[in-house]
């Protein structure tokens, strides 16, 4: 019994020599916030890395309708732009209209004499970009022919009619003289003249309308000349007609002259359209037009333009995000996410940023957790938090600025290529999209890498700042924590947080405690010997008690032990 008491006293004395068992020390850990479920983003080095927060950069849906503000959107309804320009009777309501964006519907149809335009897309684009159907009639003199020809295929009201912007010339009496007409451009703007040639379905129709068996139309300026000969022959019937009209156009520059020479089959201009330069355009869409505001329009409907990229449609009008192939690209706007471990040892010790993040810290990105004589606590470090936020704020705007600047340069260059080599138009467009899709992914990956690196750097800066403050008064425990070798109450912890900690005040106390602790650590062999001796004696006493019990039981006859030799 005396031996046991002595061992207990010795063990108590050994542990009582450890200064850390009292209120003379504190533990301070640095960490960053975390969330239970982060967002995966892509960086240069990782395809998937979890961050606390991220912003989607790709607009993937439209609002389902076309907004009529801030752009003037003109609904073509049942008319195509070309029919409205030519003056198809059912499109008369569009005469002299203006637009920023002309919407062509899939339900649009022609309701006049059947025609074709050899380069339909180019004429459509020229008129669309002009943004107006403003027309000026001119006094062409057509001598010896009959003007204002009409057709039952093109009725205006109950009467046979024709395109209102064209003048169909046929024979007068039994003659069709050669026509030579000139029209100078004395204005300071370009004039667009629309004219055509009629292709009869039979030779009989040719001579019946124009006398000559084969007509000819030549339209010239100082810069160009077009000579067209009619192709006589039957074609599929359209609105009761097997003949056709081919539509052409000529642009006359200021100071130039329009010359028309024909001996038959001429569909003459009545005047000109004033050419204008601007940002007007045309779009095929069946989306409804509504009263709302959106600066970006696609055939699917208007879309918000607060993101740098979109995956809704390649065709856009206005200030729109750039089209890319990816459905999603996420820009990291938070730090690397390391969810907090729910179980950390049997004593629930606090841990620093090396081990994991802290989900409970909601008032800042970086902060402190401490354990001292007054208990435990947590506080955010607003300065380092603000430093990180300031660097991340504006990333989205910078991405938009970079994409806009680069895109306009590429778009201008590609437009020149498309204008010269029409066969490369689709190839160039696809290449442009591929290029931007790659650039977008690379740009976002670079920005995400930068965000994660800078937020990690702010954590390290805070750790180094704290270490420099504490100096020899504390020891780095690893894992982002410090063991402070002096009594550090909440006010002391607060001074460390706000940078006013004076290590000289606590230096002597810290050194004294550190030496005591280190002294015990240096004599750890002595403590270990006592523990081993205590363990051995305890085992010996247990064996003695067990042996005494067996002998007592044998004497009482409760246990019989037979030994056979």
Swiss-Prot record:
Question: What are the GO MF terms of this UniProt record?
Answer: host cell surface receptor binding
**Lipid attachment points (S-palmitoyl cysteine):** 554, 561, 564
Q: What is its main location?
A: virion
Positions annotated as glycosylated: 23, 37, 53, 78, 180, 300, 498
Sites marked Cleavage: 344-345
Q: Name one GO biological process term.
A: virion attachment to host cell
Keywords, in A-Z order: Clathrin- and caveolin-independent endocytosis of virus by host, Clathrin-mediated endocytosis of virus by host, Disulfide bond, Fusion of virus membrane with host endosomal membrane, Fusion of virus membrane with host membrane, Glycoprotein, Hemagglutinin, Host cell membrane, Host membrane, Host-virus interaction, Lipoprotein, Membrane, Palmitate, Signal, Transmembrane, Transmembrane helix, Viral attachment to host cell, Viral envelope protein, Viral penetration into host cytoplasm, Virion, Virus endocytosis by host, Virus entry into host cell
Modifications made to the protein after synthesis: Palmitoylated.
Q: Give the family from UniProt.
A: Belongs to the influenza viruses hemagglutinin family.
Q: What else is known?
A: Major glycoprotein, comprises over 80% of the envelope proteins present in virus particle. The extent of infection into host organism is determined by HA. Influenza viruses bud from the apical surface of polarized epithelial cells (e.g. bronchial epithelial cells) into lumen of lungs and are therefore usually pneumotropic. The reason is that HA is cleaved by tryptase clara which is restricted to lungs. However, HAs of H5 and H7 pantropic avian viruses subtypes can be cleaved by furin and subtilisin-type enzymes, allowing the virus to grow in other organs than lungs.
Subunit details for this protein? Answer: Homotrimer of disulfide-linked HA1-HA2.
Task: Name the job this protein performs.
Answer: Binds to sialic acid-containing receptors on the cell surface, bringing about the attachment of the virus particle to the cell. This attachment induces virion internalization of about two third of the virus particles through clathrin-dependent endocytosis and about one third through a clathrin- and caveolin-independent pathway. Plays a major role in the determination of host range restriction and virulence. Class I viral fusion protein. Binds to sialic acid-containing receptors on the cell surface, bringing about the attachment of the virus particle to the cell. This attachment induces virion internalization either through clathrin-dependent endocytosis or through clathrin- and caveolin-independent pathway. Plays a major role in the determination of host range restriction and virulence. Class I viral fusion protein. Responsible for penetration of the virus into the cell cytoplasm by mediating the fusion of the membrane of the endocytosed virus particle with the endosomal membrane.
Q: What is this protein called?
A: Hemagglutinin
What organism does this protein naturally occur in?
Influenza A virus (strain A/Equine/Romania/1980 H3N8)
């Amino acid at each position: 019994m005396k031996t046991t008491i002595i061992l207990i006293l010795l063990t108590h004395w050994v542990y009582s020599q450890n200064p850390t068992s009292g209120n003379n020390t504190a533990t301070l850990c640095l960490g960053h916030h975390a969330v239970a479920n982060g967002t995966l983003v892509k960086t240069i080095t990782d395809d998937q890395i979890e961050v606390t927060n991220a912003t989607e950069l790709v607009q993937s849906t439209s609002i389902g309708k076309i907004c009529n503000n801030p752009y003037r959107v003109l609904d073509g309804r049942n008319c195509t732009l070309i029919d409205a320009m030519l003056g198809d009777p059912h499109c008369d309501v569009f005469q002299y209209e203006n637009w920023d964006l002309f919407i062509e519907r899939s339900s649009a149809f022609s309701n006049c004499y059947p025609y074709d335009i050899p380069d339909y897309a180019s004429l459509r684009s020229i008129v669309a970009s002009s943004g107006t159907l403003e027309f000026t009639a001119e006094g062409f003199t057509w001598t010896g022919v009959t003007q204002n020809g009409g057709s039952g295929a093109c009725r205006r009201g109950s009467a046979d009619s024709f395109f209102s912007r064209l003048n169909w010339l046929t024979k007068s009496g039994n003659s069709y003289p050669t026509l030579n007409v000139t029209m100078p451009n004395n204005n300071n703007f370009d004039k667009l003249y629309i004219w055509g040639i009629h292709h009869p379905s039979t030779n009989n129709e040719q001579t019946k309308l124009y006398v000559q068996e084969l007509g000819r139309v030549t339209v010239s300026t100082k810069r160009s000349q077009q000579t067209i000969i009619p192709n006589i022959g039957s074609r599929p019937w359209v609105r009761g007609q097997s003949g056709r009209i081919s539509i052409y156009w000529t642009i006359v520059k200021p100071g130039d002259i329009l010359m028309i020479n024909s001996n038959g089959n001429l569909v003459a201009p009545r005047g000109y359209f004033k050419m204008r330069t601007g940002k007007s355009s045309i779009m095929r869409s069946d989306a409804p037009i509504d009263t709302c505001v959106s600066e970006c329009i696609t055939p699917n409907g208007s879309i918000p333009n607060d993101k740098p990229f979109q995956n809704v449609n390649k065709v856009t009008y206005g200030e729109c995000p750039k089209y890319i192939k990816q459905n999603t690209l996420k820009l990291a706007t938070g730090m690397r996410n390391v969810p907090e471990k729910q179980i950390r040892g049997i004593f629930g010790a606090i841990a620093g940023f090396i081990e994991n993040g802290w989900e409970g810290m909601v008032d800042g990105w970086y902060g402190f957790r401490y354990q001292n004589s007054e208990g435990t606590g947590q506080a955010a470090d607003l300065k380092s938090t603000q430093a990180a936020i300031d660097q991340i704020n504006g990333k989205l705007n910078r991405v938009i600025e970079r994409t806009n600047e680069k895109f306009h340069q590429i778009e201008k260059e590609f437009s020149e290529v498309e204008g010269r080599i029409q066969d490369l138009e689709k190839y160039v467009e696809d290449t442009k999209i591929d290029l931007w899709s790659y650039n977008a992914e690379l740009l976002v990956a670079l920005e995400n890498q930068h965000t994660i690196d800078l937020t990690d750097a702010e954590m390290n800066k805070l750790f180094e700042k704290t270490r420099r403050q504490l100096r020899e008064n504390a020891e780095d425990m690893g894992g982002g924590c410090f063991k402070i070798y002096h009594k550090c109450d909440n006010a002391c912890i607060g001074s460390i947080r706000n940078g006013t900690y004076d290590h000289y005040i606590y230096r002597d106390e810290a050194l004294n405690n550190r030496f005591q602790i280190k002294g015990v650590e240096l004599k750890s062999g002595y403590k270990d010997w006592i523990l081993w001796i205590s363990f051995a004696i305890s085992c010996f006493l247990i064996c003695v008690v067990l042996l005494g019990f067996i002998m007592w039981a044998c004497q009482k006859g409760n246990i019989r032990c037979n030994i056979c030799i």
